[in-house]
Amino acid sequence: RLYHDNVLSKEPGCGRTPWHYDAHHFPLRTNNVVTAWIPAQPIILEMGPLAFATPISTYKLVESISFDKFSVSYDDAISECFKKNNVDIVNKPFDLGEISFHHNLSCHTAGRNNTNVSRVVLANTFYEDGTYIVENPTMVSGDWKKFFPGLEAGQLAKTDLNPICWERGKNVRYFY
């Protein structure tokens, strides 16, 4: 199902996106969540492309760090942890047509936009059909009620805004 689709514009001079993984942000009782990050133009390093800590299990190094939406302490603690543990960071430009798919446990960041051009990206997030909203969404979950109008915590995450985008087990056709 579609959780949301966002156009993300990082304006010229806009600062970096702090380290995080999306499981904090989506109030879903599943880890079967993926985001497609689709650049609308080539993104050079100076524009602040998406960067990842690898491997995906890196989140285990930082899952005990308390998330703080209002300060840089969380970001600083993750950065320090990654340095201490020699975590590999993949930070590369995106050519037009390249898409990043990342799991909700993938630790990621994005650099500052040091150009005079807006960095524009479409980010679509999908989750497994049959998923429930967590019992206690947090402030970090943001405007989750906008994405699930009429639903309350603990209910099945299914509204007209969350269509099934593809069905499990159905034949999928790949076009090259």
Model-derived features: positions:
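Double-stranded beta-helix
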Residues: 43-109
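Feature marks short, surface-exposed loop/turn motifs that line or immediately flank catalytic pockets
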Residues: 11, 44, 59, 128-130
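Short, solvent-exposed aromatic-acidic interface loops
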Residues: 8, 55-58, 142-145
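Conserved double-stranded beta-helix
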Residues: 1-50
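Short, function-defining helix-loop hinge/capping sites that tune catalysis or transport
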Residues: 28-30, 62, 111-113
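A short beta-loop-beta micro-motif enriched in histidine and acidic residues
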Residues: 22-33, 87-88, 94-96, 117-118
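Short, surface-exposed loop/helix-turn segments at secondary-structure junctions
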Residues: 21, 73-87, 118, 137-143
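Non-heme Fe(II)/2-oxoglutarate
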Residues: 65-67, 99-101, 105-176
